[in-house]
């Protein structure tokens, strides 16, 4: 053992003590960075967020099929039915690197799965970024600043949130590559660097920039930052031939490789503004180089001004001729945040929102103030590298304010600034502790030696200023993976689980056919493809905004108009995510807004003024005090064919597909549907899966052999039940319903044989409307009601006789009117009327018979001849009857 210790001491004796301490500190920083990013492991070993599931699929594909196969991969799982050309729609840097890491581990005997590699990959990338930031800080301000930069970056909340366990997105590799680009390019331009060294570092910068471009769409930022930096150096009189050489070598390599090696960008990227500035600044460099051969500074300034004007004019011409492509989409919204108001698909994503000063302080805490002090120190020195750091800080600060997710690109320069401030503010304290102040031999009145306790106090204040930022770092890391809480933004308490999406995806995987197509909002596309292994209409790439608008339409239309659209897309299942809570004393639950209950507003905005076929759908919002109401308008051409209220307040009505699914799923509504059958409900009722049914349209017919029969005669009823194309339904039963004199009742249930049914019936008297009712078969055929078969059954005839007790009476004398039916009936009504001219009649009374008879006593109030007649209304199977007219004479 002693010999081994001596051997180790001998081996390390050649290492300078300062260098050894530096390596030790960097190792500790690396371990701290790994440990902090591993904190989410408490909640499970998952990929986090949404995009990492795409990277996992791509990594797995590369491992199984090889790197070159990826460039020919047409993925049929996404954007059904069109699919996606993966090389044209995605960047491959992260997936290729993760696949290479997997292959390397297997080559050295580490038998890890692809999933294990991709879950752990981000934390390694984040830790390596901290080490890279050490070299950046060291090159800019020395070793002390480098070590602090590494520590600040290791514990930076913005960086942690994007490089934590399972967060396999572009940022896990992108920030590391961006920092390396800065290191290589700045080293290429270090004073005293040989041309060979300059070219070497420039080539490394160009290769790394190409690698970043194949990895992260935000590669435009470091690219254009370097271009801007070079332009500023030229315009401020800091031009050197070394700068021209490094610029030419860096972008020569980059422009040669990128159009060929990144299919998503292709050669078309060369006409974009971000790339056209590269040759523009190259011309500026050449003009400045040519100016060095001019005799005076005035001539050089004129040459540079002319070159600048020519470049501006050329850029204007390229824009007018539409040769230059200006930024669009989320890139435009980053440059100009106001344009996102017209981009609902961009604005609907929470990480695309503008940042606030509160969010900056939340991310950087007390380092915010140290960063401001660091800015003061670099402005006071203002070397070339300080100009680069200034430009990097200002531009990243602007973009971070424009897009909250881009606070990440602010992390490296801000960490460097905070490190510089800490070093510069700690220097006096260290000098005091070391007693490094040299006092003159001659005593100077008033000069007092400062004790070491003042140095300790300064260092303690700096530590107190830094520690709060580190505590926020732990809080940023100590959060579960998105899918572990079903994307609900909370940390579950002990014993509480919100794994509704994991349950739903497992159910879809195990209980639906492999060919099933699942319609869901685009947020969940990557989850459904990766974990449920099923096709989706859209995913988080949002590459086809037209199809996303169609999904929004299908969710916001009523089922009658949505089902034909779903059938066109061959939708098998629909999955919705709705968050709610039940409060004691409330009859209905309250929506929380973390699922579609908060996203349907964006569906309305995205679907608004979009068309399907000849139909255009529009949505209108009306506000009355605190109440917000949405209306859905459907137009064909200029004609409004439907105008319905779809919501009152936060809650959607049942007359939209999403409203029906949400309301029935959480128990607000008891509505039913022929098209949607809820087949899965997660444990917390947050994720609902509906099977989409496409029942055949049913056509039922009915007819009778006679439309007019006498009472007691039999009627033969026949009919058919077929689909809309005339194909008969083989078996089943048909309910026959009769509506007689406005009263509906069932006649019988007839059996269906090869699409036909028949029934013999003796109908009661009256006017009949007979219909056939097919109840349908769930998910296969729709219910149907036939057009009515009309029929009249003549009632049993009866006669009515009328007589008077006296036909000649005196005024004031009573007379008895006697009525007799040929049938002894006690239902129906008698009506007795009289007339003085046998034309205009006055009703005397209406009364029911008793056993077919009535004796009515009447005292006339006028003299002369009175004509008297009675009628019977008829009842049941007996018809009406009218008596003859009798005449009575009343004397004065």
For the regions a language model picked out, list residue spans one by one.
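Membrane-interface helix-loop-helix junctions at transmembrane boundaries of multi-pass membrane enzymes
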Residues: 15-17, 195-196, 239-245, 294-303, ...
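Transmembrane signal-anchor helices characteristic of membrane glycosylation enzymes that use polyprenol
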Residues: 16-52, 57-58, 64-70, 74, ...
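Alpha-helical transmembrane segments at the extracellular/periplasmic loop-to-helix junctions
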Residues: 271-288, 302-386
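Hydrophobic/aromatic-rich transmembrane helices and adjacent perimembrane loops
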Residues: 387-390, 395-434, 440-443, 456, ...
């Amino acid at each position: 053992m002693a010999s081994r210790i001596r051997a180790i001491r001998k081996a390390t004796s050649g290492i300078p003590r300062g260098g050894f301490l530096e390596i030790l500190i960097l190792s500790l920083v690396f371990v701290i960075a790994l440990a902090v990013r591993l904190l989410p492991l408490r909640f499970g070993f998952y990929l986090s967020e949404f995009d990492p599931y795409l990277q996992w699929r791509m990594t797995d594909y590369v491992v199984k099929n090889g790197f070159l196969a990826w460039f020919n991969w047409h993925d049929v799982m996404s954007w059904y039915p069109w699919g996606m050309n993966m090389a044209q729609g995605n960047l491959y840097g992260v997936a290729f690197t993760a696949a290479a890491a997997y292959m390397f581990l297997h080559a050295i005997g580490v038998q890890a799965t692809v999933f294990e590699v991709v879950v752990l990959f981000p934390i390694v990338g984040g830790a390596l970024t901290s080490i890279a930031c050490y070299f950046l800080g060291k090159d800019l301000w020395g070793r002390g600043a480098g070590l602090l930069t590494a520590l600040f970056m290791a514990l930076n909340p913005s960086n942690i949130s994007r490089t934590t366990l399972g967060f396999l997105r572009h940022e896990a590799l992108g920030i590391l590559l961006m920092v390396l680009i800065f290191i290589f390019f700045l080293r290429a331009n270090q004073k005293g660097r040989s041309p060979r060294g300059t070219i070497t570092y420039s080539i490394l910068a160009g290769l790394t920039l190409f690698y970043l471009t194949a990895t992260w769409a935000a590669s435009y930022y470091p690219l254009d930052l370097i271009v801007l930096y070079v332009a500023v150096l030229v315009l401020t009189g800091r031009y050197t031939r070394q700068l021209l050489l490094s610029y030419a070598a860096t972008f020569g390599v980059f422009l040669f490789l990128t159009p060929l090696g990144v299919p998503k960008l292709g050669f078309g990227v060369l006409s974009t503004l971000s790339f056209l500035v590269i040759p523009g600044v190259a011309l500026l460099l050449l003009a400045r180089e040519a100016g060095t051969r001019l005799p005076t500074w005035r001539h050089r300034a004129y040459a540079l001004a002319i070159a600048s004007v020519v470049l501006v004019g050329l850029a204007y011409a390229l824009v007018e001729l539409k040769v230059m492509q200006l930024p669009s989409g989320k890139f435009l919204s980053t440059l100009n945040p106001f344009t996102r108001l017209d981009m609902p698909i961009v604005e609907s994503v929470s990480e695309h929102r503008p940042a606030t000063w509160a969010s900056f302080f939340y991310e950087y805490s007390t380092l915010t103030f140290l960063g401001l002090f660091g800015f003061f120190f670099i402005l006071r020195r203002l070397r070339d590298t300080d100009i680069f750091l200034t430009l990097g800080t200002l531009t990243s600060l602007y973009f971070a304010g424009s897009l909250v997710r881009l606070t990440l690109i602010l992390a490296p320069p801000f960490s460097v600034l905070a490190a510089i401030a800490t070093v510069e503010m700690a220097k006096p304290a260290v000098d005091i502790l070391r007693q490094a102040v040299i006092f003159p031999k001659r005593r100077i009145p008033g000069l007092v030696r400062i004790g070491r306790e003042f140095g300790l106090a300064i260092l303690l204040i700096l530590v107190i200023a830094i520690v709060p930022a580190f505590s926020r770092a732990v809080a940023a890391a100590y959060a579960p993976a998105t899918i572990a809480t079903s994307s609900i933004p909370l940390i579950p308490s002990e014993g509480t689980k919100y794994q509704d999406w994991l349950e739903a995806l497992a159910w879809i995987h195990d209980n639906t056919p492999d060919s099933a197509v699942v319609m869901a909002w685009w947020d969940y596309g990557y989850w459904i493809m990766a974990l449920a292994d099923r096709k989706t209409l859209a995913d988080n790439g949002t590459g086809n905004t037209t199809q996303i608008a169609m999904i929004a339409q299908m969710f916001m239309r009523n089922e009658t108009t949505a089902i034909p659209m779903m059938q066109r897309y061959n939708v098998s299942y629909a999955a919705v995510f709705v968050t709610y809570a039940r409060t004691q004393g409330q009859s209905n639950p309250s929506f929380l807004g973390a699922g579609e209950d908060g996203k349907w507003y964006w569906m309305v905005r995205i679907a608004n003024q979009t068309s399907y076929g000849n139909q255009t759908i529009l949505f209108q919002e009306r506000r009355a005090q605190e109440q917000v109401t949405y209306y859905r308008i459907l137009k064909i051409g200029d004609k409004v064919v439907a105008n319905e209220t779809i919501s009152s307040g936060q809650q959607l009505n049942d007359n939209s597909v999403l409203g029906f699914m949400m309301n029935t799923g959480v128990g607000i509504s008891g509505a039913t549907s022929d098209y949607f059958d809820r087949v899965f409900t997660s444990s917390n009722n947050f994720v609902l899966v509906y099977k989409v049914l496409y029942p055949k349209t049913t056509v039922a017919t009915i007819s009778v052999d006679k439309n007019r029969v006498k009472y007691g005669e039999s009627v033969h009823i026949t009919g058919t039940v077929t689909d809309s194309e005339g194909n008969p339904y083989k078996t089943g039963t048909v309910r026959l319903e009769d509506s007689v004199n406005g009263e509906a009742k069932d006649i019988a249930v007839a059996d269906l044989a090869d699409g036909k049914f028949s029934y013999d019936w003796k109908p009661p008297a009256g006017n009949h409307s007979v219909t056939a009712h097919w109840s349908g078969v769930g998910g296969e055929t729709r219910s149907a009601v036939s057009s009515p078969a009309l029929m009249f059954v003549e009632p049993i005839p009866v006669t009515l006789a009328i007589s008077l007790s006296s036909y000649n009476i005196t005024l004031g004398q009573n007379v008895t009117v006697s009525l007799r039916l040929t049938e002894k009936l006690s239902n129906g009504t008698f009506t007795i009327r009289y007339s003085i001219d046998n034309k205009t009649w006055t009703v005397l009374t209406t009364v029911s018979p008793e056993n077919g008879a009535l004796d009515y006593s009447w005292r006339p109030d006028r003299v002369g001849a009175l004509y008297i007649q009675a009628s019977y209304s008829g009842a049941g199977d007996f018809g009406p009857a009218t008596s003859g007219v009798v005449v009575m004479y009343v004397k004065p």
